[in-house]
């Protein structure tokens, strides 16, 4: 049976729909950076998703080819994630989606090295006749965070974020969004197949102890 990161690491991917504090260890991702409204057809964000899955499935299916990854085991591709920010803005202003910057990403299993990633980019480029040069190997050490499961429209996330920030302050923490620590979303539902009222998204914000 394929290893499923969502089920094996429920604390990261399946939190309760009430806020909690969690320490996130460093993980490696495949990632694509971009800017613009995530809802724009053929925009940078939607294009980034296609690039990510092209590499993710090349790595996932590598065991069927000649490139052997040391320590490989069969697994379910982890969910799509996104780091989001806007210039000169603490958090996100959902009314200014065109100003959003993002790092779209998918977690890599620990056994995938940078060399394996580089092989996958070359292999996908050759087989799919597509440019994957925007995809990068991205280690991210997220650290201490407050997180919560948000159920419903992405545009309603501010309500969940307010709950997270109230919980954070009540427990002696403050927000620590910086140039290297971001508003983080993990997408557990496919918006093309799920009613908007039932979308499940993990929302995560970096924090630090209040001095």
What is each PLM-predicted segment?
Residues 1-211:
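A solvent-exposed interaction/effector surface
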């Amino acid at each position: 049976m394929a290893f499923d990161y969502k089920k094996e690491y429920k604390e990261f991917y399946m939190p309760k729909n009430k806020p909690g504090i969690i320490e996130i260890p460093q993980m490696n991702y495949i990632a694509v950076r971009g800017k613009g409204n995530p809802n724009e057809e053929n925009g940078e964000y939607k294009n980034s998703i296609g690039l990510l899955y092209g590499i993710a499935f090349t790595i996932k299916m590598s065991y069927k080819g000649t490139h052997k990854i040391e320590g490989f085991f069969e697994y379910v591709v982890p969910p799509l994630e996104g780091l989001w920010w806007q210039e000169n803005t603490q958090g996100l202003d959902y009314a200014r989606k065109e100003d959003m910057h993002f790092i779209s990403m998918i977690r890599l299993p620990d056994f995938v090295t940078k060399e394996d990633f580089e092989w996958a980019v070359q292999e996908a480029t050759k087989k799919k006749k597509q440019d994957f040069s925007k995809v990068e190997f991205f280690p991210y050490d997220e650290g201490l965070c407050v997180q919560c499961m948000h159920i419903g429209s992405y545009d309603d996330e501010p309500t969940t974020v307010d709950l997270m920030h109230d919980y954070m302050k009540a427990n002696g923490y403050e927000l620590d969004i910086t140039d290297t620590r971001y508003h983080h979303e993990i997408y557990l539902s496919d918006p093309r197949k799920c009613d908007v009222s039932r979308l499940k998204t993990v929302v995560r914000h970096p924090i630090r102890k209040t001095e």
